[in-house]
UniProtKB/Swiss-Prot annotation:
Pfam families: M20_dimer, Peptidase_M20
Function: Catalyzes the conversion of N-acetyl-diaminopimelate to diaminopimelate and acetate.
Organism: Streptococcus uberis (strain ATCC BAA-854 / 0140J)
Source organism, top-level taxon: Bacteria
Catalyses which reaction(s): N-acetyl-(2S,6S)-2,6-diaminopimelate + H2O = (2S,6S)-2,6-diaminopimelate + acetate
Group of enzyme by EC: hydrolase
Protein name according to UniProt: N-acetyldiaminopimelate deacetylase
HAMAP family according to UniProt: DapEL
Length: 376
């Protein structure tokens, strides 16, 4: 039987950023191959630094998938743990070490006997920075074993151990990176009529885009448009020739994201025209679409866990953070849910340290849920 706490601590010590998870992949493969040896109904293959484990059913009518992300973050750990990161400037500060450990625990349970339906375990690299889920899907890595349903979890620091949370709609917002460049004509501050001030135009733009949320977005759906960076000019008495803005869009549905991107682009072009400037708008959503749970499958999952005597299943509001599982859910119906890990520090914090008791508490119930899905 796997020592899941020891496994989690080993994974925690070797965090690697997206598409560089070589040591992580090697460690996972060593455990997976041990679990799957002498099991002729199981196939294993790799994709870049990711891993796919396929459990063929004896009379399959569907394929159910479980996805775990693998990568760490470029953060210097400050937990003081005896098993802290051994990789300088790298940390599992988003709980992906817990995610991988849970997946291995589920795999160990489900390889004991061949089930009726197919089961696919997806160990996915590069969730944090490269939209690895989208890359994996678009490369055709899943084509041979394309799932009909897919499930995943994410640790949540502010929920107690033994609590799971989800909803029947959107769990994570979709994110879109925005870069806008206004180009005008520089000049002396004393002669603005001989110049064309890009900074003034950019200032108008930042103010005007706030009306997208207040006047174009359905208040029930919600959205965020934030510009966290504006760079223009070099000194106090020179009019800026160029202004560069860098921001983000967060929305709870893909349709709302498309609307917000459209209105932002129209505003940038309109302001540029009114000031006689050139403008370039670059929008990058990549694979970070909203995590939109399938209502029917979410209802089944929530109802199942609410029957548990050991798990507290609650229904929650969406989070405005992003997750690349949204891309896979745009292709395959499925559900993501939160796993409470009870720590005072938030995700991506250098001191974030999940309570390992969450693994033992939740694993049997999640195993039972998957077993019901692949045996019905």
């Amino acid at each position: 039987m796997l020592d899941l706490i020891a496994i989690r601590r080993q994974l925690h010590q070797i965090p690697e950023i997206g598409l560089e998870e070589y040591q992580t992949q090697a460690f996972l493969l060593s455990v997976i191959e041990q679990l799957c040896q002498d099991k002729p109904f199981i196939q294993i293959k790799t994709w870049k630094t990711g891993i796919l484990v396929f459990l063929k059913g004896y009379a399959p009518e569907k394929t159910v998938a479980w996805r775990s992300d693998m990568d760490g973050l470029p953060i210097t750990e400050e937990t003081g743990l005896a098993f802290a990161s051994k990789h300088q400037g790298r940390m599992h500060a988003c709980g992906h070490d817990i995610h991988m450990t849970m997946a291995l625990g589920l795999l160990e349970a489900l390889v004991e006997k061949q089930s009726k339906h197919n089961m696919l375990f997806i160990f996915q690299p590069a969730e944090e920075n490269e939209a690895g889920g989208m890359l994996m899907y678009q490369s055709g890595a899943l084509d041979e074993w394309m799932p009909d349903e897919v499930y995943a979890l994410h640790v949540r620091p502010d929920l107690p151990v033994g609590t799971l949370a989800s909803n029947r709609a959107t769990l994570f917002a979709g994110t879109c990176e925005v870069k806008v460049s206004f180009k005008g004509k520089g000049g002396h501050a004393a002669f603005p009529h001989h110049a064309n001030d890009a900074l003034v135009a950019a200032s108008y733009f930042v103010t005007q885009v706030q009306t997208i949320v207040s006047r174009n977005v359905d208040p029930i759906e919600g959205a965020v448009v934030t510009f966290g960076s504006l760079h223009a000019g070099t000194t106090n008495n020179v009019i800026s020739q160029e202004a560069l803005l860098h921001g983000t869009i967060r929305t709870l549905t893909h349709d709302m994201s498309q609307l917000t991107q459209k209105r932002l682009t129209e505003m940038a072009e309109g302001i540029a025209k009114s000031f006689g400037l050139e403008v370039d708008v670059h929008l990058k959503q990549g694979g970070y679409l909203p995590v939109e749970n399938n209502p029917e499958l979410a209802d089944e999952l929530i109802s199942f866990f609410k029957e548990s005597d050991t798990i507290n299943m609650i229904e929650c509001l969406p989070a405005m953070t992003g997750e690349d599982f949204g891309f896979l859910l745009s292709k395959v119906k499925g559900v993501m849910f939160w796993l409470g890990v009870d720590t005072p520090y938030p995700l991506h914090h250098a001191k974030m340290s999940p309570d390992e008791g969450a693994i033992k508490q939740a694993l049997p119930e999640i195993k039972a849920f998957l077993e019901e899905n692949i045996e019905d």
